């Protein structure tokens, strides 16, 4: 279920300030953040944001296609190792 349209998109204030500061100076550097819940805005395009996945910061390069999505969508938290079970090939 999505967010109400009357509320608008959400982005943490500290992250938005960092992006605006980099846009003013024209610098490109990696921004570390724990804010997986923040929506990607058009101002973010071209920046690399290191999103925390619970273990480490995953670098995510922001493109135009990502606008409107959440940062957490691009940094998976769990790695699927496969289902546990009998390995029938090794028993033969």
Swiss-Prot record:
GO molecular function annotations of the record:
rRNA binding; structural constituent of ribosome
Q: Which PROSITE patterns match?
A: RIBOSOMAL_S19
Please indicate if the UniProt record lists RNA-binding as a keyword: yes
Q: Which UniProt keywords apply?
A: Ribonucleoprotein, Ribosomal protein, RNA-binding, rRNA-binding
Q: Which Gene3D superfamilies match?
A: 30s Ribosomal Protein S19, Chain A
The answer on whether this UniProt entry bears the keyword Lipid biosynthesis reads no
Cellular component GO terms, alphabetical: cytoplasm; small ribosomal subunit
Q: Which domain of life is it from?
A: Bacteria
Q: Which GO terms describe its biological process?
A: ribosomal small subunit assembly; translation
An example of a Pfam family matching this protein is Ribosomal_S19
Record InterPro entries: Ribosomal_uS19, Ribosomal_uS19_bac-type, Ribosomal_uS19_CS, Ribosomal_uS19_SF
S-S pairs: none
Q: What does this protein do?
A: Protein S19 forms a complex with S13 that binds strongly to the 16S ribosomal RNA.
The text of the family note is:
Belongs to the universal ribosomal protein uS19 family.
Q: What is this protein called?
A: Small ribosomal subunit protein uS19
Organism expressing this protein natively:
Geobacillus stearothermophilus (Bacillus stearothermophilus)
